[in-house]
Amino acid sequence: MFDEKNKFTDASFENCDLKNPADRDTLKQAADELLKMHRGKEEVCADVEEEKNESTDLLATLQDENKELKDQFLRLAADMENLRRRTIRDVADAKIYSIANFARDMLSVSDNLNRALEAIPADARESDTNLKMLAEGVEMTERAMMAALEHHGVKKICPEGQKFDPNFHQAMFEISNSDVPDNTVQQVVQAGYIIGERVLRPAMVGVAKGGPKENSTEADSA
């Protein structure tokens, strides 16, 4: 059945006579028109299919680009998070360790104050009131200095009786002692200090030798 816009309708063929040349021409024109319409529909279908394929390809391309952008975003976010953590750590380290050199110098001053106090004979200190007051003033100054350093994160290392640790201790000499395990700190010659997790100055110590080895001590206790 023909479309209403087609000039060839059912009524056009009601009285057609195939023997009549004019009617045959009419039928031929109708057939040509139908063929043209059919070919037009095929072309439209082909165009639609092509557009569909192009849309599918475009969608796949967009999906790939979206995935790539997502990966880039995730990598950037991870880099930013690492930078944030590193910045926080650097700021914290700067806050803790910014006074390290100053603290190390103040420890030398503290050592000198202690040496000055040790140089005062005990009897002279007791018999001379002025000397006694001077010594007490020096002691107060030294304590206040160490309290200030401790307030800023400086801690004293007191390793006597502990296992020798080269990261925190400096062995100055050995002490023969068979009663304690080897490498036990027996004497502290000069106190050590740390700030945060860093060593400002290792403790200078004497280390026991000649006692039971650490492994044998652990085996005996087991």
Curated annotation (Swiss-Prot):
GO MF terms held by the record: adenyl-nucleotide exchange factor activity; protein homodimerization activity; protein-folding chaperone binding; unfolded protein binding
Cross-referenced SUPFAM superfamilies: Coiled-coil domain of nucleotide exchange factor GrpE, Head domain of nucleotide exchange factor GrpE
GO term, biological process aspect, one: protein folding
InterPro entries documented for this protein: GrpE, GrpE_coiled_coil, GrpE_head
Protein name in UniProt: Protein GrpE
Function, in words: Participates actively in the response to hyperosmotic and heat shock by preventing the aggregation of stress-denatured proteins, in association with DnaK and GrpE. It is the nucleotide exchange factor for DnaK and may function as a thermosensor. Unfolded proteins bind initially to DnaJ; upon interaction with the DnaJ-bound protein, DnaK hydrolyzes its bound ATP, resulting in the formation of a stable complex. GrpE releases ADP from DnaK; ATP binding to DnaK triggers the release of the substrate protein, thus completing the reaction cycle.
Organism encoding this protein: Bartonella bacilliformis (strain ATCC 35685 / KC583 / Herrer 020/F12,63)
Pfam families referenced in this protein's UniProt entry, alphabetically: GrpE (PF01025)
TM helices/strands, residue ranges: none
GN (gene name): grpE
Gene Ontology, cellular component aspect: cytoplasm
Subunit and partners: Homodimer.
Family: Belongs to the GrpE family.
UniProt subcellular location: Cytoplasm
Keywords: Chaperone, Cytoplasm, Stress response
PROSITE patterns noted in UniProt: GRPE
